[in-house]
From Swiss-Prot:
Forms a cylinder of 14 subunits composed of two heptameric rings stacked back-to-back. Interacts with the co-chaperonin GroES. Its main location: cytoplasm. It catalyses: ATP + H2O + a folded polypeptide = ADP + phosphate + an unfolded polypeptide. It comes from Alcanivorax borkumensis (strain ATCC 700651 / DSM 11573 / NCIMB 13689 / SK2). GO terms for biological process: protein refolding. This is Chaperonin GroEL.
Length: 548
């Protein structure tokens, strides 16, 4: 296919136009008084959002060269979102400022490579200052404030995230689901829960809740399918003599083995239940081992020379309580040694560090949570499905932001941290005037988030930036109330990681765009129908009526 190629200024101008179209749509959402954006859906009602990355993802431009610019800024938003889970709008505003300021300098005849080196030098210095500005976020109040800000000043979201983190700890897994009521709800699962239910409804002993409840049971863990009852009999007899309930977790239990367990349970000879082991393949083996460590038991596996016929009570784990419903099994208060559990958690953490797959990391993190903390589910309440989806996206953002805050601490919010870091950096000198121009344009770009927040709040941006610049420490502008003051005291915080990721992602992509000299795209195809033969002569077929 033939290609269309643009060079120099023409290429950069078309690219900048695409950047500005996308950034202008995204930046209206910034700050406490940011507006909504309505997104058309191919079917069903449109969705309404204040989430920058959701807006960016929807934008595709007709002009291929403009679209390239837009897609590169979309990459900035996605990169910030992937690394910190928030800060996408800030990253987009910064990228737009870097590109526009940079292209002005390039058009004026400056060397793009030196400009980029100046930008990189200034960004590195500002990142170091942000680290110095950050304060630890380790109490419920600051976690609540970060969650509130990230959820667009929705206090209820900040509160529920802080409660969830308090309940399950910072290692715990917090998930967000759509709820059934108008209010947000928090559901905390203590102990280890996995998504496997009872193998037969005949194990149910609490008819009201349709659950199996086992108090102080033995737990038999088997890494294979059980279909022959003779293998199970010795273990069953030992447990029956001890007079305790039994939970069997195996790859599968079927045929006469399952039938015998059901009959013994119904006759009251031994209170028992059976569930499939969670996960598949190697992950199932690892999760069985997790359960063994949590309950103080041993996985009966032929790989390590253990057979089911020779299993003794010492090989079985125990727990204070086990609840099993149709879909989930929850083990509460396993009898495993704390030192063993801590060792296992440390081992899984090392696996997380060495893993390159996001999916594997997420699954490993879930295993850590099940061993060390717990699982909390935030159920989102709303009056309509459209509101529910918008709210869920905001809560997801807020959750990522609070995790980022716990990780790297918090800095003053509302665009103040960048302005303050800028003031603290002092004078940086490049190797030549063009690098100095790159440093200067970075300093101008860093004010843009504060300007945009002020603009969205209907205030005079230049006056506010000057006032904040003249202040010290955490002094800044509260766009929600229109007042100046200490941002930390007013509860306006941003996670340092979010601000840092936004700045680095924006500078990285903008540096590439400034140094672009040519753009190549497919040539638009001519109208395919233009060369087709004229069908006008078919009109004479009207006379065919006489053939009837």
């Amino acid at each position: 296919m033939a290609k269309e190629i643009l060079f120099r200024d023409e290429a950069r101008q078309r690219m900048a136009k695409g950047v500005n179209i996308l950034a202008d749509a995204v930046k209206v959402t910034l700050g406490p008084k940011g507006r909504n954006v309505v997104l058309e859906k191919s079917f069903g009602a449109p969705s309404i959002t204040k989430d920058g990355v959701s807006v960016a993802r929807e934008i595709e431009l007709e002009d291929k060269f403009e679209n390239m610019g837009a897609q590169m800024v979309k990459e900035v938003a996605s990169k910030a979102n992937d690394e910190a889970g928030d800060g996408t709008t800030t990253a987009t505003v910064l990228a737009q400022a870097f590109v526009n300021e940079g292209l002005k300098s390039v058009t004026a005849g400056m060397n793009p490579m030196d400009l980029k080196r100046g930008i990189d030098q200034a960004v590195a210095a500002v990142v170091e200052e942000l680290k110095k500005l950050s304060t630890p976020c380790d109490n419920t109040k600051s976690i609540e404030q970060v969650g509130t800000i990230s959820a667009n000043a929705d206090k209820s979201v900040g509160e529920i995230i802080a409660q969830a983190m308090e309940k399950v700890g910072q290692e715990g897994v917090i998930t967000v689901e759509e709820g059934q009521s108008l209010q947000n709800e928090l559901d905390v699962v203590e102990g280890m829960q996995f998504d496997r239910g009872y193998l037969s409804p005949y194990f149910i002993n609490n008819q009201e809740k349709m659950q199996v409840e086992l108090e102080d049971p033995y737990i038999l863990l088997v890494d294979k399918k059980i279909s022959n009852i003779r293998e199970l009999l010795p273990a069953l007899e030992n447990v029956a003599k001890a007079g305790k309930p039994l939970l069997i977790i195996a790859e599968d239990i079927e045929g006469e083995a399952l039938a015998t367990l059901v009959v013994n349970n119904m006759r009251g000879i031994i209170k028992c239940a059976a569930v499939k082991a969670p996960g598949f393949g190697d992950r199932r083996k690892a999760m069985l081992q997790d359960i063994a460590i949590l309950t103080g038991g041993t996985v009966i596996s032929e790989e390590v020379g253990l057979s089911l016929e020779n299993a003794s009570l010492e090989d079985l784990g125990t727990a204070k309580k086990v609840n099993i419903d149709k879909e989930n099994t929850t083990i509460v208060d396993g009898a495993g040694q704390q030192a063993d559990i801590d060792g296992r958690v440390e081992q899984i953490r090392k696996e997380i560090e060495n893993s390159s797959s996001d999916y594997d990391k997420e699954k490993l993190q879930e295993r850590v949570a099940k061993l060390a903390g717990g699982v909390a589910v935030i159920k989102i309440g709303a009056a309509t499905e459209i509101e529910m989806k918008e709210k869920k996206a905001r809560v997801d953002d807020a959750l990522h932001a609070t995790r980022a805050a716990v990780e790297e601490g918090v800095v003053p919010g509302g665009g103040v941290a960048l302005v303050r870091a800028l003031a603290n950096v002092g004078t940086i000198k490049g190797d030549n005037d063009e690098q100095n121009a790159g440093i200067a344009l970075t300093f101008r770009a860093l004010e843009m988030p504060l300007r945009q927040i002020a603009y969205n709040a209907g205030a005079e941006a230049s006056v506010i930036v000057q006032e904040v610049r003249n202040g010290k420490g955490n002094y800044g502008y509260n766009a929600a109330s229109g007042e100046y003051g200490d941002m930390l005291e007013m509860g306006i915080l941003d996670p340092a990681k979010v601000t840092r990721s936004a700045l680095q992602a924006a500078a990285s992509i903008a540096g590439l765009m400034i140094t672009t000299e040519a753009m190549v795209a497919d040539k638009p195809e001519e109208n395919a129908g233009a060369g087709a033969p004229d069908m006008g002569g078919m009109g004479g077929m009207g006379g065919m009526g006489g053939m009837m």
